[in-house]
């Protein structure tokens, strides 16, 4: 590397980034072969990682989007405009959960909830119901879930390749039932451990651990073959008030983010402040503003779009990456993590010739007037060489180097 080829992103992150240091946390790691642990393959889609569950009795197969900022599980239903009418409420080709076909579904007395702004639909309105919910071979009765009841016909919402959202956000300090993810409810009922493990197979020599998918989620424990427990660094989550609407405006304000980890559905690229991005571009001689056609192609690579800032995109040479800077992230004043050029320079595979671009995410919420950032979003580019452990009991998460084989 060149002498200047290190861009040090000195962030007090995951204290959201407060100056206080997160306390060390002891995690209980259990093998993915345990009977109350489910290891599930997930496929990458432009929306994020998708995996399958079953809901109801008899079981209905539902493809879920993994979302580390969502809370209680959500399913598309045959409801809209306060009525059950699948012909009106579900667009042709859209998968959904049919509550009338389940003998175990029940409504609840929880009030209807609406989020005016989401990446999926405007005025995102849900009712709450309960039903049997299975992750792999682990089934839980009476799981509280969100059931769509949008204030418009189903034709208004574009067809998407999943029928639900699997929330993986930590519970807030003051826990309410409507804020509990499926796995938290299962742990509370003694059917599953409090941990969730995650890794992608993108950089592995063998993708066997992902079971035919692009990533693996382990509910109730972790895959201890993919990392060394001795090398895990843990962080307690800390959510200041100003972070409460980091993803979407929310009433009441949110205080339960993994401050801030997201597996890719909100930002694929290496996270930088605007100033950091400009610095990076200045130190890469081949960087050129991308054409409109290339920008359109880049945007089709993935991301929900809501939290992606209006930023310039740059093409760079696909060669000579050893002259590009490393990106070094220091979390909470402690552990430093590095993203090498090979992980933030991405080649567009569906364009003629050899076209590479800087896959950098200047998060919308992270922008400030002076170009610095109080918060960055650690997405896929950061996590693909890490094993991620979410601890719902301790409200903490851990990172360890992924054993690539």
UniProtKB/Swiss-Prot annotation:
Family under the similarity heading: Belongs to the peptidase A1 family.
Peptidase A1 domain location: 49-400
Disrupted-gene phenotype: Does not alter fusarin C production.
EC number, as in UniProt: 3.4.23.-
Gene responsible for this protein: FUS4
UniProt cross-references to PANTHER family, sorted A to Z: BETA-SITE APP-CLEAVING ENZYME, ISOFORM A-RELATED
Superkingdom classification of source: Eukaryota
Role, per record: Secreted aspartic protease; part of the gene cluster that mediates the biosynthesis of the mycotoxin fusarin C. Within the cluster, FUS1, FUS2, FUS8 and FUS9 are sufficient for fusarin production. The other FUS cluster members are not essential for fusarin C biosynthesis.
Pfam family, any one: Asp
SUPFAM superfamilies in the cross-refs: Acid proteases
The UniProt record lists the keyword Secreted: yes
Residue pairs linked by disulfide bridges in the UniProt entry: 318-356
GO CC aspect terms: extracellular region
Induction: Expressed under high amounts of nitrogen via regulation by GLN1. Moreover, components of the fungal-specific velvet complex VEL1, VEL2 and LAE1 act also as positive regulators of expression. Finally, expression is induced under acidic conditions in a PACC-independent manner.
Compartments, as annotated in UniProt: Secreted
Signal sequence segment: 1-24
A molecular-function term among this protein's GO annotations: aspartic-type endopeptidase activity
Residues with attached carbohydrate: 52, 61, 107, 123
Protein's recorded name: Secreted aspartic protease FUS4
Keywords: Aspartyl protease, Disulfide bond, Glycoprotein, Hydrolase, Protease, Secreted, Signal
GO biological process annotation, one example: proteolysis
InterPro entries: Aspartic_peptidase_A1, PEPTIDASE_A1, Peptidase_aspartic_dom_sf
Keyword Transport among record annotations: no
